[in-house]
Amino acid sequence: QRLHFAQSLEDAVKDVEFVQENAPERLEVKIDVLAQIDHAAPPEIVIGSSTSGYAMSEMQVKCKHPERTVVAHPFNPPYLVPLVEVVGGKQTDPALVDWAIDFYNAIGKYGLRCSHELPGFVANRVQEAMWREALHMIANNEATVEEIDAAVTYGPGLRWPIFGPLLTFHLAGGEGGMGHMLD
């Protein structure tokens, strides 16, 4: 059996190798749940949080072992999208960030080391920039929701898994690369 139900948090984390917290996206809830997991889990166990925007430095404040806590943000839907953004907090042991990345890579995910604790991390910030532009075009009656969704779905949405947005522009710049595109 791979799926087990526990009657308490203590029972849920007593014989594990890793904990992935998935509490609601409210800072006070994340802080309390991480502190409870930290108290109940053996001290050598790494604790990952699925937060989509909070810094680990904000969430690890009540943990007795904050060095073992990392953001481990899977991208939805996680059964299809391999990305897991991994970033430590101010008190996180950098070796445990490496461990978490290796863990996710070993289970077929793509563990992306985020070098800074940015609100929303990397993927959500890039996605939100595009979303802001889409909302701007809709508000100004420049495009419809359907046009924008179709444009991304059948255009860059298909290309970006191969090249990503920056490599796409670098290649489009020809011999001068992205520098030529910026001129």
Regions found by a protein language model. Give the residues of each.
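N-terminal alpha-helical segment
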Residues: 30, 79-80, 130-131
